[in-house]
Amino acid sequence: MQAPRREDARRQGEGLATLSEAAPRSSGDGGADGIAPLAQEADRLAQEGGRGQPAAPGTATLEPPERGGGGDPSAVLSIRPRQEVAGRGRPSADAAAGQPVPPTLWYKDAVIYEVHVRTFFDGNGDGTGDFRGLTAKLDYLQELGVTALWLLPFYPSPLADDGYDVADYTAVHPAYGTLGDFKRFLAEAHRRGMRVITDLVLNHTSTQHPWFQRARRARPGSRWRDFYVWSDSPDRYRGVRVIFPDYEADNWTWDPVARAYYWHRFYAHQPDLNYDNPMVRRAMLKVVDFWLRLGLDGFRLDALPYLFEREGTACAGLPETHAFVRELRAYIEARYGERVLLAEANEPAAELARYLQGDECHMAFHFPLMPRLFLALAREEAAPILQVLRDEPAIAPACQWALFLRNHDELTLEMVSPQEREELWQAYAADPQARVNLGIRRRLAPLLGNDRRRLELAYALLFSLPGTPVIYYGDEIGMGDNIYLPDRHAVRTPMQWSGGRNAGFSTANPQRLCAPVVVDPPYHYEAVNVEAQLASPDSLLNWLRRLIAVRKRFPAFGRGDLELIAGDNRRVLAFVRRLGDQAILVVANLSRFVQGVRLDLAAYAGCLPEDAFGGATLPPIERRPYFLTLGPHGFYWFVLKRPEGEIPEPR
Ligand SMILES: OC[C@H]1O[C@H](O[C@H]2O[C@H](CO)[C@@H](O)[C@H](O)[C@H]2O)[C@H](O)[C@@H](O)[C@@H]1O
Ligand SMILES: [Ca+2]
């Protein structure tokens, strides 16, 4: 491992815009220390909520807590029901008639694209991506086939954790534009039929958030103090793991102003909110109101397991946390109808399934599957994937896994055994510079050796296994990374739009860019960029567009069951996705060599496999094993068709 980076962590905001540069909206709002009192903050939210309207009946109210501030987490919040059930921020005809709008389960058929406003496209030429820039690129995303966007945090923040350190939940970071710019972006996305979800950083704030600044000065035991988790000694919750071990030694940090320790699961500049305090829960519901009234389609719930702490536990996924998620879901559903909650919970599958029982989240990222896709590619055998699929716990019919290969963080190896982690590090991060915490800070293409066949295979699995695929911006063109940037900025470099100035990301002076563009020779923006790939019919980008278009023809991929198909070659993975009379056979060769496989497809005897891409039909399936050959890292998607159109019942 590289030398510990704890000091780096405290400096990591350097070179990036700071909140003070970005004109903090809270200063001057009143209060002796320049910080708005919470009640005033609540009033502001009420005034600004959604479209400049006062808080609607039925939304959360910030009432003074009962004395002592603690409270029973299972207690029902003070919420008055409201009759409105809106679609896209406006009551629909049904809602206006008082009828709930039936859920569409749109997220099951979605193709989600994770995008960082900061590094996607600079619309005003100041070197930093912004909402004007993102809006200008919506046509590109639509043509790619994307149907939903997930935006990383774009709120006012000192950016010491790239926005996951929120200083104001209900505004836009000035570097990214205005709330008006956000509204225009949302309207334009909706006009193209795209949904938008954003990160909701529930667990913690920045130390610069007015709530923390007030808490640290407040009297111990007071309602303001109790917005965060304090202790006189760092001995509470001993043994709870540190999530960023390269940067932090402990989950407690001494605050000289409060003269107490505060709890933080992530960086020391990210104090955990105290969800035992009903005021915190209400405050977060007001944040939810603010964005949903604007018409947002849902939230990625960041760091969801860590909301509550209890002595003697791992302080993760506690019953109290699930109780709060249920309240959050019920609150949203009663007021806004179908808005999606996507859990970011880096936990084993059995734990994840607890969020997916129908009354908490709609989706959860499949953290156990992701590293096993990479393990299967490294070992060139199907077993690691099969193991996850066989052990997969049941989830409610309306729920869905969110599948991903890469995201804005390190490729986290928290969900594999220490031996598997070592194996993955050896296979994908031989250079210690590529490692961070318990993971690997590399993008998809460098991880897979820029090998086009392996990239296509990885995408073919992402788009055919049960769940909704999530693409990380830039991975559609096989962008590289910069492991010499601090922390996870390695994988957050500017989008490469062209071979021109600043990769087409910005017209600014190159020295003013929010992050350097990639110039590593194999991934240099002059070679790897959208413009060049759009012009090349065989580019990765055009190939992926075709793959997405094919997936969209078959609802079985988003909504169907999974049937594993037995074969006689451990290097080949085979399964059928079924929905009604639609059945798609997926066969994937994990090895770099040609493979043959005999598949037990007796249940489909009589069916004709038709290639979903080219339409060629193979000989009919018989009761005896069906023989297929696959090229290196080859894969097939076959539509199983009976001559008379009937597909047999599942076994
Ligand atoms: O807001 C703090 C962090 O929350 C998310 O972290 C998640 O990613 C971590 C890896 O970087 C992972 O170890 C942890 O279990 C997750 O909660 C968010 O995605 C991070 O960017 C952020 O720093
Ligand atoms: Ca800009």
State each model region's role.
Residues 2-6, 12, 16-21, 25, ...:
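Active-site and adjacent substrate-binding regions of carbohydrate-active enzymes
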